[in-house]
Amino acid sequence: MSLLDAHIPQLIASEANFGAKAALMRSTIAQAEQAAMSSQAFHMGEASAAFQAAHARFVEVSAKVNALLDIAQLNIGDAASSYVAQDAAAASTYTGI
């Protein structure tokens, strides 16, 4: 029995919604990388070297963004499950009103 006023279904829905938004972000990053790879052939000489350096940095940063999205989604899920578990465990210690 929960005595605290928390909207658990909202926490669960937030995790699912965040997952959908994270998937959209990942898709956008993948599309940007595909567009960059398609335009790579147009660069020559110094422009080609600059493009390759910028693209390498983009790939590095996009990997970090994806990792942060994974961590954020896990944290939202953990918040809901740990809240429910701790609240249920503490509910037995409450005395009747």
Curated annotation (Swiss-Prot):
GO cellular-component term (any):
extracellular region
Q: Where in the cell is it found?
A: Secreted
Q: Which InterPro entries match?
A: ESAT-6-like_sf
The UniProt keyword set, sorted, is: Secreted
Its quaternary organisation is: Forms a tight 1:1 complex with EsxH.
The entry sums up its family as follows: Belongs to the WXG100 family. CFP-10 subfamily.
Name of the molecule in the record:
ESAT-6-like protein EsxG
Give the organism, scientific name: Mycolicibacterium smegmatis (strain ATCC 700084 / mc(2)155)
- Underlying gene: esxG
